[in-house]
UniProtKB/Swiss-Prot annotation:
The keyword Cell membrane does not apply. The keyword Nuclease applies. Belongs to the CRISPR-associated endoribonuclease Cas2 protein family. HAMAP family: Cas2. This is CRISPR-associated endoribonuclease Cas2. The gene is cas2. It comes from Methanosarcina acetivorans (strain ATCC 35395 / DSM 2834 / JCM 12185 / C2A). Pfam families: CRISPR_Cas2. CRISPR (clustered regularly interspaced short palindromic repeat), is an adaptive immune system that provides protection against mobile genetic elements (viruses, transposable elements and conjugative plasmids). CRISPR clusters contain sequences complementary to antecedent mobile elements and target invading nucleic acids. CRISPR clusters are transcribed and processed into CRISPR RNA (crRNA). Functions as a ssRNA-specific endoribonuclease. Involved in the integration of spacer DNA into the CRISPR cassette. Coiled coil: none annotated. Homodimer, forms a heterotetramer with a Cas1 homodimer. GO terms for biological process: defense response to virus; maintenance of CRISPR repeat elements. InterPro entries: CRISPR_associated_Cas2, Virulence_VapD/CRISPR_Cas2. CDD domains: Cas2_I_II_III.
Length: 87
């Protein structure tokens, strides 16, 4: 499945969330990650993020699709990094 994760967390937790997500996904811009995940990886990520955040003040949104080709993705400006050749 293809997943996009967007988060707004307290400044004291940003580095922990970003570091964790970098293990599984591509960092495309501040507070946004995307990538191909298995169902097991997706569930593991959701579980770990629940431990890292404070649900009373932080917010994370998960967008998922069977495949990236089903998403209409457009961007403007300079992306953070080229992820087209990452295996």
């Amino acid at each position: 499945m293809y997943v996009v994760i967007v988060y707004d967390v307290g400044v004291e937790r940003v580095n922990k969330v970003r570091s964790f997500l970098r293990e599984y996904m591509n960092w495309v811009q501040n507070s946004v990650f995307e990538g191909e995940l298995t169902k097991a990886e997706f569930l593991k990520i959701k579980s770990r993020l629940k431990e890292l955040i404070q649900e009373s003040s932080d917010h994370i949104i998960f967008y998922s699709s069977r495949d990236r080709k089903y998403l209409g993705i457009e961007d403007l400006g300079t992306p953070k990094a080229d992820t087209s050749n990452i295996i």
